[in-house]
Amino acid sequence: EKKLNKLLMKAIDEAETNEDKARLLSVCWESGLDFANDFMYFVRYALDDDFIVSMEAFTVAENIEELKEEQLTEAILFIDQNSKSNSVAAEQLKTFIRSKIN
């Protein structure tokens, strides 16, 4: 399973178009694979300028279970440091992450 995760992520990184990236991201959440160790990877793509890429990555992140509090805290810090001001996607992502923190 881990090899398949890495293969999918490599394909996303190497995709030539945003449309291809979005399709591959949708495969990640539709596959039911466990991407818990790769949460930050999808957080980064959830901040992408392309709406569809961002939405698909957000969906993957949203469907990851068993996240550690450290991962969630790291994600919020990353979003704060790397999102454009007033980014709706960033605010929605932070709201989701905060809801997962116990």
Roles of regions detected by a PLM:
Residues 74-95:
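Preference for long, well-ordered alpha-helical segments
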Residues 16-17, 49-50, 86-87:
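Short inter-helical turns and helix N-cap capping residues of alpha-solenoid HEAT/ARM repeat scaffolds
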Residues 1-12, 33-47, 69-79:
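Amphipathic alpha-helical scaffolding segments comprising HEAT/armadillo-like alpha-solenoid repeats
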Residues 1, 10, 21-33, 54-67, ...:
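Structural detector for internal amphipathic alpha-helices that build alpha-solenoid repeat scaffolds
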Residues 39-63:
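Ankyrin-repeat and related helical/solenoid repeat scaffolds used for protein-protein interactions
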